[in-house]
Curated annotation (Swiss-Prot):
It comes from Shewanella baltica (strain OS155 / ATCC BAA-1091). This is Chromosomal replication initiator protein DnaA. ATP binds at G170, G172, K173, T174. Domain I is involved in oligomerization and binding regulators, domain II is flexibile and of varying length in different bacteria, domain III forms the AAA+ region, while domain IV binds dsDNA. Residues 126-342 are annotated as: Domain III, AAA+ region. Residues 343-462 are annotated as: Domain IV, binds dsDNA. Gene3D superfamilies: 1.10.1750.10, 1.10.8.60, 3.30.300.180, P-loop containing nucleotide triphosphate hydrolases (3.40.50.300). The gene is dnaA. Residues 84-125 are annotated as: Domain II. The keyword ATP-binding applies. One of its GO terms (molecular function) is DNA replication origin binding. Plays an essential role in the initiation and regulation of chromosomal replication. ATP-DnaA binds to the origin of replication (oriC) to initiate formation of the DNA replication initiation complex once per cell cycle. Binds the DnaA box (a 9 base pair repeat at the origin) and separates the double-stranded (ds)DNA. Forms a right-handed helical filament on oriC DNA; dsDNA binds to the exterior of the filament while single-stranded (ss)DNA is stabiized in the filament's interior.
Length: 462
């Protein structure tokens, strides 16, 4: 009875959570009765803690609504339910067997058409050891991406395969790829982990064709334990490369070997890539990495300054973070310039000093992002008239874009709420605040709004 109740609860959670949240946290759970207690089994400690912290109240409330005082007690455990014949999550990848001529430190490399790279005992991993989960600054914009990456590192080839991360340039996708690779290697030094840009895969295939070594190419890429490919959108219109990757993809998944892909856009929006590939990209878990919000931008600056041995005043970090919003790479580049100028001149890092050091960059940002620019961009995106943005019309087709534009104005400009309200037809600041809160809520609940907002930020920040 209680297990059946859990199935009903799953239906409720699927309605209330986003597809990403449901796939990451609820789908991996298994349920079984133990006396008067319903035990929920999570695949690992990370999932267990997250579900217990975030969703236990929703679950208990549903049980009480359905069964009142007869509702079962709830307990969490790690693993699979004892009666399960098979685990719901595939077993972790087995380490690749290596020949006696190879070192145990074999991890990954790029393809070499002259000889199979695995025959070289001295080749090194191309996973960057400096990219770790510990130095990845987490915020709302990348929380799901980091959580998924952590689980893949702990259980490669398991729950989320393939993992597809998408978002604009400089948001931390590559950092997460390397962090996963480092996590896999830490747990299994014999694992063969390969990271590369999609253009390198294409180059390797072309060289293999030129050197009559296509079989070696296939053997190498289909033998890895984990394959991470950055910027998969560069496969567009490269038919032979897509054909080879299609078969490589299938071979790796059949062997429960982990695949992680990144792109600057949602899989179905990648032009020039075969539908059968785009379909496979969505077989596992697809997660958006969005531009960092203000608090995360500040945290990134403070972490970077700390790593550089620089004391960055809080007010300076906020000043920079409020004005540079597009991506992490831009933030770090700006801070590097400030630090270099401070070291060269010997002057303390103050807001006035930062204004001077980043004069051209700040001027460009202020010129690019204005409320008027946001209104025009949003009106064009949603195909409404600019006049509607300022009107009193309340139909959803107009009100929702107006709310999106208000939220973007708060995030991307330095204008106050009253100033934003004035720019939207003399509206009160409480209307702007309500719009910002409503859009923040919808970005959690609606995939379409989340995508629209991310697309608009990319457009306005480019």
């Amino acid at each position: 009875m209680a297990v059946s109740l859990w199935q009903q609860c799953i239906g409720r959670l699927q309605d209330e959570l986003s597809a990403q949240q449901f796939s990451m946290w609820i789908r991996p759970l298994q349920a079984e009765m133990d006396g008067d207690t319903l035990v929920l089994y999570a695949p690992n400690r990370f999932v267990l803690d997250w579900v217990r912290d975030k969703y236990i109240n929703i679950i208990n409330q549903f049980f009480t609504e359905q069964m009142g005082s007869d509702a079962p007690k709830l307990r969490f455990d790690i693993g699979s339910r004892p009666s399960a014949k098979k685990p719901s999550v595939p077993a972790p990848i087995a380490p690749t067997r290596v020949a006696n001529t190879q070192t145990k430190a074999t991890v990954g490399t790029t393809f070499n058409v002259q000889a199979e790279p695995m025959a070289n005992a001295n080749h090194r991993s191309n996973i960057n050891p400096s990219y770790q989960f510990d130095n990845f600054v987490e915020g709302k914009s990348n929380q799901l991406g980091k959580a998924a990456a952590l689980q893949v590192a702990e259980n490669p080839g398991g729950a989320y395969n393939p993992l597809f991360l998408y978002g604009g340039t400089g948001l931390g996708k590559t950092h997460l790829l390397h962090a996963v690779g480092n996590g896999i290697i830490k747990n299994n030094p014999n694992a063969k982990v390969v990271y590369m840009h999609s253009e390198r895969f294409v180059q390797d295939m072309v060289k293999a064709l030129q050197n009559n070594a296509i079989e070696e190419f296939k053997r190498y890429y289909r033998s890895v334990d984990a394959l991470f490919i950055d910027d998969i959108q560069f496969f567009a219109n490269k038919d032979r490369s897509q054909e080879e990757f299609f078969h490589t993809f299938n071979a790796l998944l059949e062997g429960n070997h982990q695949i992680i892909l990144t792109s600057d856009r949602y899989p179905k929006e990648i032009d020039g890539v075969e539908d059968r590939l785009k379909s496979r990209f969505g077989w596992g878990l697809t997660v958006a990495i969005e531009p960092p919000e203000l608090e995360t931008r500040v945290a990134i600056l403070m972490r970077k300054a700390q790593e550089s041995g620089i004391n960055l005043p809080d007010e300076v970090a906020f000043f920079i973070a409020k004005r540079l919003r597009s991506n992490v790479r831009e933030l770090e580049g700006a801070l590097n310039r400030v630090i270099a100028n401070a070291n060269f001149t010997g002057r303390p890092i103050t807001i006035d000093f930062v204004r001077e050091a980043l004069r051209d960059l700040l001027a460009l940002q202020e010129k690019l992002v204005t409320i008027d620019n946001i209104q025009k961009t949003v009106a064009e995106y949603y195909k409404i008239k600019m006049a509607d943005m300022l009107s009193k019309r309340r139909s959803r087709s107009v009100a929702r874009p107006r709310q999106v534009a208000m939220a973007l104005s708060k995030e991307l400009t330095n204008q106050s709420l009253p100033e934003i309200g004035d720019a939207f037809g003399g509206r009160d600041h409480t209307t702007v605040l309500h719009a910002c809160r409503k859009i923040a809520q919808l970005r959690e609940e609606s995939h379409d709004i989340k995508e629209d907002y991310a697309n608009l930020i990319r457009t306005l920040s480019s």
